[in-house]
Amino acid sequence: MKYQDLRDFIALLEERGELKRIQQEIDPYLEITEISDRTLKAQGPALLFENVKGHDMPVLANLFGTPDRVALGMGQESVTALRDVGKLLAFLKEPEPPKGFRDALNLLPKYKKVLSMSPKSIKKAPCQQVVMSGDDVDLTKLPIQHCWPGDVAPLVTWGLTVTRGPHKERQNLGIYRQQLLGPNKLIMRWLSHRGGALDFQEWCQQHPGERFPVSVALGADPATILGAVTPVPDSLSEYAFAGLLRDSKTEVTQCLSNDLQVPAHAEIILEGYIEPGEMAAEGPYGDHTGYYNEVDEFPVFTVTHVTHRKDPIYHSTYTGRPPDEPAVLGVALNEVFIPLLQKQFPEIVDFYLPPEGCSYRLAVVTMKKQYPGHAKRVMMGVWSFLRQFMYTKFVIVCDDDVNARDWKDVIWAMTTRMDPARDTTLVENTPIDYLDFASPVSGLGSKMGMDATNKWPGETDREWGEPIVMSDEVKQRVDELWDELNIMES
């Protein structure tokens, strides 16, 4: 599905009745959050606020408010089609050698397409149609959303942060929230294991005391945004992956004040630097857990240049108790993760991140069990294979006769196939999201694995129960009689 930028995607949504323009004056202080939250919970459209109080710039919200819109942003017509995206990533992550000449010929188009999607650099970029620098930089002119009553300040939420570590060709793209600190200051909240933070750490080691170049794109196209939150193999840039999603090369342009390349068709670009040692207290903010997080210190991002398109659109969101946009993203990306996990663990049948589990904190896995202890191997694999699951606190493993997406099925398996002492695995002192205030130490906590599979010899000495199943003949006979019986007729 070809679209070049956010505006193309907005037009596509409007054609499909998936976008609502709001002309009434709406305050970015709390009101946009409340309207967006109600709309998302009703599985409503993306929202374009065209009359934002105190600003002449429209705000786009609830863009990824349904799994189908996430799929559309990734170039697919349905959520189930995202399995194909996952299969492509699994292939790129661990490509298998061709089994013969014919297989090699069949693989050629796939390799050719991947190699042809390197980003295209252009000079006269739409994102640099208007340029402000020095004293003209004033971030308060942006309609930055103040999401919750207890939030300390307005918060940039969909900023696509572009960094590059020393001696690295590939740039890193990441989504990190940024607290408004002043007219030209933001706080860059990135966790220590994220790509941007790692680039910064390496820079400080290689260039002590020198400013670290950073750029942030606001209002990038959906494929590029989603590429930044997808487990793209290290051999492939997020820009190239975005090109694969939308079936057209990502156009980029070099920043005015540094050598970073940003999406050429983004709505707004912030350019600047992080001064090593310049830190500020970030938070509290309402987060995806449904609670306000604790205050912590993060680097300060000083903005030296703001460039933007003519009549720019500001893209925003909020996070709160699920469901919110991160939870919806989790539901959609769940389908991308499954082929990646199956590549490493073919015995996995399904994998589910319930949205009420705050996107990633609880996972349910169903599998074709083959030997004693197999369930424990799979739960350990979930925690270790993809970095996206290093913060998953609970993993429940069931047999393939259980529907991972039906709590009635999962709870039945847990209560009939588990002994709490034997089948619960606790792992202490593991990485935990620092926003998880339930952990005893910030950033360090425990994990629980639950083996809700049928037990094999070696796992139990008792005779194991056999599930009750009606015979097919009787079921067929009753199917034929059912309408005639009129049991459900009032």
Swiss-Prot record:
It is found in: Cell membrane. Its main location: membrane. Its EC number is 4.1.1.98. Pfam families: UbiD, UbiD_C, UbiD_N. Binds 1 prenylated FMN per subunit. The active site is at residue 287. SUPFAM superfamilies: FMN-binding split barrel, UbiD C-terminal domain-like. This is 3-octaprenyl-4-hydroxybenzoate carboxy-lyase. The gene is ubiD.
